[in-house]
Amino acid sequence: MRRLLVPSSALLWGLQLAFLSPALALILVNLYGATTTEVGWVLGIYNAGGFVAALLLPAYADKKHNYLGPMLVCGALTLLLAVVLASVTSLPIATIALVVIGGPAGVGSSLLFAHLRHGGASAVDIVNTRAIVSVAWVAGPPLATFIIGWFGNRAILLAIAAVAVLNITTTAVMITYRNADVRAAAADGTQPASPAATAEESPVGRLGIVLIMGAFILLQATNATAMTIMTVYVTETLHLDVQWAGIALGVAAALEVPALILIGRLSGRHSHLGLIATSCVAGIAFYLGLAFVTGPVLLIGLQVLNAWSFAGIAGIGLPLFQQMIPRPGLSTGLYMNTRRVGSIVSGPIIAFGSLTALGQRGIFLTCAGLTLTGLVIIAIARRTTKPARGDRLPATT
């Protein structure tokens, strides 16, 4: 049972996000009468709150060297958020709830990965756990739309509450096992080993950290751009049925899981920055292919490149940040925030790219150029890596 706790927790946190993220706009419109403009503002404020929470809560956990306790609080806040959103009818109150309650509640998955790193988990373990989160994202959005379609908008809030209860239970059991280990160590007169994650010296200098963070913001932005514009691009530029956009995104999500597992295995033998460089090359090829694709067969085939590109960003990126920044909570929070900032940057990418003579195809050419820029930045950052330490994580727990 104990071995199933971390995978179960990863699946539940993934389901929570996969249920809420695609359904939130519908909830705001149908339950609170929000206009499109209001939805944009609310989501922006909500993401800003999440950005701050992703820094403060993990930093507090670092200070206490305790990640499961705050993770339990995040589960309780998720349950409270679902209850509040189902009860209120005012958009301003719902917005306040999303910022004050939803922001911290969304940090739970970050704390799980920080807990793993604090306990000395290997890069392979972390990437495999991240693959489980991707499994949740394969099933979560379709299941969420099914629940809303058959049972109404408030039903998805009930589903989120149910997931939160399971999350609370799983985390409580993890805390019980941890406390039992501490008591057993005290009874034997032994001291728990110092967490490797907090004892390591960063193999990357401050300049390297800044460069890699900048590169990841670009990579996250291009990935978010492709996901955001795919449906519109397929229908308006390729003149295909909208179902092909859904098929393409579904195939990409399904391929992410084996890609993450494969890149996790490779991380034990190859440089992390080198693997990320291969994902950048795949991303450049993917965006160039999208810019010139004309039919559904190539559109679907290109998702293999998309999956490998994402595996580098999501799979290797997380343990790389945890290695660069010895504090597990802060490093994980900063990594998660590169996605939030990247999502913000994706808006200008879409606006700028669509103004070119190529129309929407120009968006993907812009993405290819930005990914190439990210690759160059990573190559420069690699030169700042300390030769004595390398740029990969230990392969053992």
Where are these predicted regions, by residue range?
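Structural signature of the two symmetry-related core transmembrane helices
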Residues: 69-83, 274-289
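Helix-loop boundary and gating motifs at the non-cytosolic
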Residues: 1-47, 215, 223-234, 245
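A late C-terminal transmembrane helix in Major Facilitator Superfamily
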Residues: 326-356
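Hydrophobic core of transmembrane alpha-helices in multi-pass small-molecule transporters
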Residues: 11, 92-108, 217, 298-312
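Intracellular juxtamembrane helix-capping segments at the cytosolic ends
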Residues: 106-120, 311-326
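Helix-to-loop junctions at the C-terminal end of transmembrane segments
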Residues: 53-66, 148, 259-271, 354-355
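A membrane-interface helix-boundary motif in multi-pass transporters
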Residues: 35, 146-164, 352-371
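Cytoplasmic helix-loop-helix junction between adjacent transmembrane helices
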Residues: 99-133
